[in-house]
Amino acid sequence: MKREYQEAGGSSGGGSSADMGSCKDKVMAGAAGEEEDVDELLAALGYKVRSSDMADVAQKLEQLEMAMGMGGVSAPGAADDGFVSHLATDTVHYNPSDLSSWVESMLSELNAPLPPIPPAPPAARHASTSSTVTGGGGSGFFELPAAADSSSSTYALRPISLPVVATADPSAADSARDTKRMRTGGGSTSSSSSSSSSLGGGASRGSVVEAAPPAMQGAAAANAPAVPVVVVDTQEAGIRLVHALLACAEAVQQENFAAAEALVKQIPTLAASQGGAMRKVAAYFGEALARRVYRFRPADSTLLDAAFADLLHAHFYESCPYLKFAHFTANQAILEAFAGCRRVHVVDFGIKQGMQWPALLQALALRPGGPPSFRLTGVGPPQPDETDALQQVGWKLAQFAHTIRVDFQYRGLVAATLADLEPFMLQPEGEADANEEPEVIAVNSVFELHRLLAQPGALEKVLGTVHAVRPRIVTVVEQEANHNSGSFLDRFTESLHYYSTMFDSLEGGSSGQAELSPPAAGGGGGTDQVMSEVYLGRQICNVVACEGAERTERHETLGQWRNRLGRAGFEPVHLGSNAYKQASTLLALFAGGDGYRVEEKEGCLTLGWHTRPLIATSAWRVAAA
């Protein structure tokens, strides 16, 4: 149209005004006809393409696609965006609404020789989408460096460099062309890949910047200032994060609080570059270190914590198989100990919501010869609102027992600590009938005994009380970890290993559960996982930030519990192969259970994530005199 107007004007250079008017009328008439010939669908999208040019435009678009595809072959990976990014920064295009001329201009640019592509920064050369930190062996789960002694200088304090920043400074480029080819934040959208780190070497990717359409880039380049693109090497940041955590713990042990404070301030920045389990674990350990460095202790809210802990405990039960495994293996040992008994009594040192006992009641109801008379004593802490939560639990269990026709009796004991219990509290009420069969007692403790280690002599008193009632069996479930070391650095390193694996199992289990139970089918695993992370985070804070009587999460290994119970007059009871097989079957039914492992260890059963045991179930009886 533009050339037609110029030719019309040129032909009337020496003519009369009437001739000029005639030419003007012809131009207007041609324009009107051209607008009528424009494709209506493309016109609605803002593009002017005549129907007669549709075939030509389609051919040019196909050629453009082929040219861009050839460019992608020569510039693999993240360089694809850089291959065509100069179209928005180096070239002045025709009006984009004129689709035919716009495509033709880009096609001519692609056919021209391209400037050299600058090498990608090291952080963007490899990619990894795993949120799991692996060791050099690639074991498949979160593995940290081996624990170091307090005297080791492996994790000596050293400065941690800031993330690499790619700027658009022309002086830093080899040429103006290289400067223009570096994408900036003006008009582009950025997205970060899944964070990943490998302590033994491997792949990682930093921030990736995706190019916007050429028209948007051209407009943004003209109107918006250049924004630096931050490229973070997540592999290096992950290694520095772990070293910063351990160096901070070493500084705390040496009471070098100035160095510890400097490291505490760097940990959140390093943790932000990570993803998945590593970021969450680092956040909780960073918070715990900050509480210890700044000597910040929350207000005394023991009663409120008891109610909130029960809520978190319920979510932890739903999100992963650890508590299910604990209840199942303990119930199996109790069921075998009650074989042939007509009157049985279970003392639960931490009844919580009573989730362990419906399964045992049902198993007893199906026992050949009929169910026994079942009495349950539930021990729990006082409630903040002074409600009788223990009786509410007993009422629900009584209703369930009635439906399956089991003779059921219940009694709740409120105790601030298990050390307050006396033997007479666990004995049957009233005098026993001489004609009745004696009552067989079982004592059950799930994640309770380690809390007694905070008070000198408390564990010995409780074990003495248990020994006095002469139980047929005592079932104990505890964390398989040593978080009761006198050295703060050793305790910190061990807990970092333990909870990293625990969080990794939550991530792995939740992903498998999401596949089998999508939200539309009522999966609802998101809330359970978040609350379970809070449940574990409170334990981390207690292990790291607290000391003395406040530090109640004093977990010990199976070997240490074996020594303590042996000194108290108990001997181990072998958990049979039947419990092992049924526990393995239970895990096979649990979503995401591929990473969980059940192992038998000296007559006890452990449940772990891959090769790391995390909890252990053991059974005991009063040793023969």
Curated annotation (Swiss-Prot):
Residue ranges of the motif LxCxE motif: 246-250
One annotated Gene Ontology cellular component of this protein: nucleus
Region listing for Required for possible homodimerization, in residue ranges: 241-278
Start and end residues of each stretch annotated as SAW: 545-621
Domain GRAS: 232-621
Entry's transmembrane regions: none
UniProt region (PFYRE), positions on chain: 441-542
Sequence motif: VHIID, positions: 344-348
Biased composition (Low complexity): 189-198
Keywords, comma-separated and alphabetical: Transcription, Transcription regulation
Region (Leucine repeat I (LRI)): 239-294
Chain positions of motif DELLA motif: 39-43
Span of the annotated motif LXXLL motif: 449-453
UniProt xrefs under Gene3D superfamilies: Transcriptional regulator DELLA, N-terminal domain
Pfam families (UniProt xref): DELLA (PF12041), GRAS (PF03514)
Stored InterPro entries: DELLA_N_sf (IPR038088), TF_DELLA_N (IPR021914), TF_GRAS (IPR005202)
Segments of this protein annotated with the region Leucine repeat II (LRII): 392-431
Source organism, top-level taxon: Eukaryota
Signal peptide annotation: none
Family: Belongs to the GRAS family. DELLA subfamily.
Domain-level remarks: The DELLA motif is required for its GA-induced degradation.
Job of this protein: Probable transcriptional regulator that acts as a repressor of the gibberellin (GA) signaling pathway. Probably acts by participating in large multiprotein complexes that repress transcription of GA-inducible genes. Upon GA application, it is degraded by the proteasome, allowing the GA signaling pathway. In contrast, its overexpression prevents the GA signaling pathway and induces a dwarf phenotype.
The protein's name: DELLA protein SLR1
Organism, as annotated: Oryza sativa subsp. indica
Taxonomic lineage from the root: Eukaryota, Viridiplantae, Streptophyta, Embryophyta, Tracheophyta
Gene: SLR1
